[in-house]
Curated annotation (Swiss-Prot):
UniProt function note: RuBisCO catalyzes two reactions: the carboxylation of D-ribulose 1,5-bisphosphate, the primary event in carbon dioxide fixation, as well as the oxidative fragmentation of the pentose substrate in the photorespiration process. Both reactions occur simultaneously and in competition at the same active site.
Binding site residues for Mg(2+): K191, D193, E194
Lineage: Eukaryota, Viridiplantae, Streptophyta, Embryophyta, Tracheophyta
Originating organism: Sarracenia flava
Cofactor (UniProt): Mg(2+)
Additional observations: The basic functional RuBisCO is composed of a large chain homodimer in a 'head-to-tail' conformation. In form I RuBisCO this homodimer is arranged in a barrel-like tetramer with the small subunits forming a tetrameric 'cap' on each end of the 'barrel'.
Protein's name in the database: Ribulose bisphosphate carboxylase large chain
Catalytic activity: 2 (2R)-3-phosphoglycerate + 2 H(+) = D-ribulose 1,5-bisphosphate + CO2 + H2O; D-ribulose 1,5-bisphosphate + O2 = 2-phosphoglycolate + (2R)-3-phosphoglycerate + 2 H(+)
Superkingdom to which the source organism belongs: Eukaryota
Enzyme class: lyase
Family: Belongs to the RuBisCO large chain family. Type I subfamily.
Alphabetized NCBIfam families for the sequence: PRK04208.1
Subcellular location: Plastid, Chloroplast
EC code: 4.1.1.39
Length: 465
């Protein structure tokens, strides 16, 4: 008879409320804001269609394949409480729609085209359920939390870091000097800022050499293993690998990548190189707020965090809850658990739409960084626990006596908080008291307490449910 040409409603094909999801399906939760007059079922079905097999009209080649096998299905829709004309649309995608081991392909399919769709006023991807059948096709983090602790020989406490400031303008020699002072004072890591790549005032090779010198000198003096996140991000993938190879030849423990500006393809390749060559990989999330800050449009950071765990990274920045950068406590802890734990139970109060089973994929250390100082230490220790990296840039380098005393202040504050917690004290209630007690026998900490006693960044978090 031929096929029936013409345009038909998406919901006739792609809205299937009686569908039972399979254990191998990738499940997505979208926050959909339809245009006026578009029913939510049609909007949800349109999302399922445009992010899987559908197009705007019936095509004769539909008859050459099994749509039932390959189409995305919108299987449930619920209104968002307290919001007008917003719905959560749940979509199930058959696994065969995706290339194995490619975050790039997964995102191109699920969010590649549909966000510009005219029938929608706005669209946000809130969460993804990655089935083990798919996550098992990824290497994941180069090493993971336990292997990193074993490499560094550091247990039972969060790790301490510091971003070297001013982020741009220092010569390589002075930069290395700042690194040495911080590491000598008691930090575990120092860090290249995300936009430190290879600029005219400091070429990458010079920076790598002076930082390596600083690391070895500080290790010799303190007897502890030290590291500096050498930013390998570059304009081409070949150049990035060249920098990672040089870092490996210097014998340093860790390199760094800006995974959103660098891209998932480059990130996954770098993660593979890092595992094969014993390098840890620190991930910075520069550009994330462009994608995740709007409440009704874009992609929530928990999805970007899951994608990073699949693509590969040993550390990733994840907000502070208490500093100058974004993060509501329950929601932040939700995606922190998604980064660290093997199995995470569905919990809508924390923004977790699906239970996620990572099976044996290594975990990622969350990094708390941005506007934090010694007075925040009890809260950070309590909120993030041992498996985290606490990074104080200005909170180290802004110390009135210099970098090394700034590092000493942070290390003393951290050790005091960990000891108090281990003795059963309540960090949330007694935090200030614990810091004050410790500062009595640490002049460096006392000076830091004095400088930052009044600093607060008091704005409400945007990232609410």
């Amino acid at each position: 008879v031929g096929f029936k040409a013409g345009v038909k409603d998406y919901k006739l094909t792609y809205y299937t409320p009686d569908y039972e999801t399979k254990a191998t399906d990738i499940l997505a939760a979208f926050r959909v804001t339809p245009q006026p007059g578009v029913p939510p079922e049609e909007a949800g079905a349109a999302v399922a269609a445009e992010s899987s097999t559908g197009t705007w009209t019936t095509v004769w080649t539909d008859g050459l394949t099994s749509l039932d096998r390959y189409k995305g299905r919108c299987y449930h829709i619920e209104p968002v409480a307290g919001e007008e004309n917003q719905y959560i649309a749940y979509v199930a995608y058959p696994l065969d729609l995706f290339e194995e081991g490619s975050v790039t392909n997964m995102f191109t399919s699920i969010v590649g085209n549909v966000f510009g769709f005219k029938a929608l006023r706005a669209l946000r991807l809130e969460d993804l359920r990655i089935p083990p059948a798919y996550s098992k096709t990824f290497q994941g983090p180069p090493h993971g939390i336990q292997v990193e602790r074993d490499k560094l020989n550091k247990y039972g406490r969060p790790l301490l870091g510091c971003t070297i400031k001013p982020k741009l303008g220092l010569s390589a020699k002075n930069y290395g000097r700042a690194v040495y002072e911080c590491l000598r004072g008691g930090l575990d890591f120092t860090k290249d800022d995300e936009n430190v790549n290879s600029q005219p005032f400091m070429r990458w090779r010079d920076r790598f050499l002076f930082c390596a010198e600083a690391i070895y000198k500080a290790q010799a003096e303190t007897g502890e293993i030290k590291g500096h996140y050498l930013n390998a991000t570059a304009g081409t993938w070949e150049e990035m690998i060249k920098r990672a190879v040089f870092a490996r030849e210097l014998g340093v423990p860790i390199v760094m990548h800006d995974y959103l500006t660098g891209g998932f393809t480059a990130n996954t390749s770098l993660a593979h190189y890092c595992r094969d060559n014993g390098l840890l990989l620190h991930i910075h999330r520069a550009m994330h707020a462009v994608i995740d800050r709007q409440k009704n449009h874009g992609i929530h950071f928990r999805v970007l965090a899951k994608a990073l765990r699949m693509s590969g990274g040993d550390h990733i920045h994840a907000g502070t809850v208490v500093g100058k950068l974004e993060g509501e406590r329950d929601i932040t802890l939700g995606f922190v658990d998604l980064l660290r734990e093997d199995y995470i139970e569905q919990d809508r109060t924390r923004g977790i739409y699906f239970s996620q089973d990572w099976v044996s994929l290594p975990g990622v250390l969350p990094v708390a960084s941005g506007g934090i100082h010694v007075w925040h230490m009890p809260a950070l220790t309590e909120i993030f626990g041992d498996d985290s990296v606490l990074q104080f840039g200005g909170g180290t380098l802004g110390h009135p006596w210099g970098n090394a005393p700034g590092a000493v202040a942070n290390r003393v504050a951290l050790e005091a908080c960990v000891q108090a917690r281990n003795e059963g004290r309540d960090l949330a209630r007694e935090g200030n008291e614990i810091i004050r007690e410790a500062s009595k026998w640490s002049p460096e900490l006392a000076a830091a307490c004095e400088v930052w006693k009044e600093i607060k960044f008091e704005f409400p978090a945007m990232d609410t449910l």
